Amino acid sequence: MNKNKREKEFYSVDVGDSTFTVLKRYQNLRPIGSGAQGIVCSAYDHNLERNVAIKKLSRPFQNQTHAKRAYRELVLMKCVNHKNIIGLLNVFTPQKTLEEFQDVYLVMELMDANLCQVIQMELDHERLSYLLYQMLCGTKHLHSAGIIHRDLKPSNIVVKSDCTLKILDFGLARTAATGLLMTPYVVTRYYRAPEVILGMGYQANVDVWSVGCIMAEMVRGSVLFPGSDHIDQWNKVIEQLGTPSQEFMMKLNQSVRTYVENRPRYTGYSFEKLFPDVLFPADSEHNKLKASQARDLLSKMLVIDASKRISVDEALQHPYINVWYDPAEVEAPPPLIIDKQLDEREHTVEEWKELIFKEVLDWEERMKNGVIRGQPSPIGAAVINGSPQPSSSSSINDVSSMSTEPTVASDTDSSLEASAGPLSCCR
């Protein structure tokens, strides 16, 4: 494509404190979120005739870390296609050559709210269970390709008014190609698993701990382990769950074990005391979902010793979750990750830049030739043992509405603006 023709396809518009240079098919840009990795705005796509979210990556070539993260996010989003993971609709850059290349734009599905907002609402058992089921389905799909998310948190999970849930932001994900033990990585502290806090390395069920923390927050309406720093986070965990056994201590390296063993010992609290019945909605007559089942699931996910913690597969079979079980959703074909050494690769900024530019051009070429994967279909009427899933028209527990802007969560826990539009899956 010649320079003049390409330039005519784009226009520039100020969005907040940033300038977006986007394809003319995208109109009515409006800021909805920002964070360390990018700025997100909503827009109307005249080609698809739908609202979308456009994320402009923030200074992707500032240094090797930023460049590698941008490459990882783009590659993983291109590979993954599941109804519970945010769909990538388009990728583009206004620059026409590698020498000029500096901006990357990702176009994604637009959702109604993130889980931070849902946590402030009252949920009946059907909705709580169904949201968790989708969270686990999306996580399992990533795990099936050896991808560990590592950064699951309420602001990285988005929902629509019909209770559709999707996981997003893969810049912190990594592949598990080199073995079981992996290095610690800074994720949002409150949802960080003990094995990460203690530098033990981790396996796939590190994400299960995060799901457990999120579930606990949905039940309690507040963060379960609100640590003020790395050490305080561990203290908050053992104060509530109790000091782990000597068997667990022996798995720690010597310096960490010495520190942990010298901390005050806590007996912890029973899950009945941590999550009393009063925190839960009334038991569901519709499908027999009960507070006791939800509490049992929490007790299996929030286990300090990862070797004794429930797996994603086991969580999906739990009575509180498996009422929604659909093999087509749970056993969806794993994404094909072509670059098996995605996280082990090291390059200069210029090399990462060239790799990203090639990925963008590849997407543009496939779009031009019509060779682009279909997007995840709406959840529609999933069934619960033959009964329809909770929908926006459900009368269960007199659904009321919450006002939120349509939004895609940013990679921080802030910058989401509220205003109109019901989130009617919650009451």
Swiss-Prot record:
Positions of disulphide bridges: none
Tissue: Expressed at high levels in the ovary and at lower levels in brain, gill, heart, spleen, liver, kidney, muscle, bladder and gut.
PTM comment, free text: Dually phosphorylated on Thr-183 and Tyr-185, which activates the enzyme.
Active-site residues annotated for this sequence: 151
Domain annotation Protein kinase: ranges: 26-321
Phosphothreonine found at: 183
Skewed-composition ranges (Polar residues): 404-417
Alphabetized UniProt keyword annotations: ATP-binding, Biological rhythms, Kinase, Nucleotide-binding, Phosphoprotein, Serine/threonine-protein kinase, Transferase
Pfam families listed in its UniProt record: Pkinase (PF00069)
UniProt motif (TXY) ranges: 183-185
Regulation: Activated by threonine and tyrosine phosphorylation.
List of residues that carry Phosphotyrosine: 185
Biological process according to GO: positive regulation of NLRP3 inflammasome complex assembly; rhythmic process
Catalytic class of the enzyme: transferase
Catalysed transformations (reactions): L-seryl-[protein] + ATP = O-phospho-L-seryl-[protein] + ADP + H(+); L-threonyl-[protein] + ATP = O-phospho-L-threonyl-[protein] + ADP + H(+)
Biased composition (Low complexity): 387-403
Residues given in the record as ATP binding sites: 33-40, 55
Region called Disordered, residue ranges: 372-427
EC number, UniProt record: 2.7.11.24
Cofactor: Mg(2+)
Domain comment in the entry: The TXY motif contains the threonine and tyrosine residues whose phosphorylation activates the MAP kinases.
Family (UniProt): Belongs to the protein kinase superfamily. CMGC Ser/Thr protein kinase family. MAP kinase subfamily.
Protein function: Responds to activation by environmental stress and pro-inflammatory cytokines by phosphorylating a number of transcription factors, primarily components of AP-1 such as c-Jun and ATF2 and thus regulates AP-1 transcriptional activity. May play a role in the regulation of the circadian clock.
Protein name: Mitogen-activated protein kinase 8B
Source organism per UniProt: Cyprinus carpio
Source species taxonomy: Eukaryota, Metazoa, Chordata, Craniata, Vertebrata
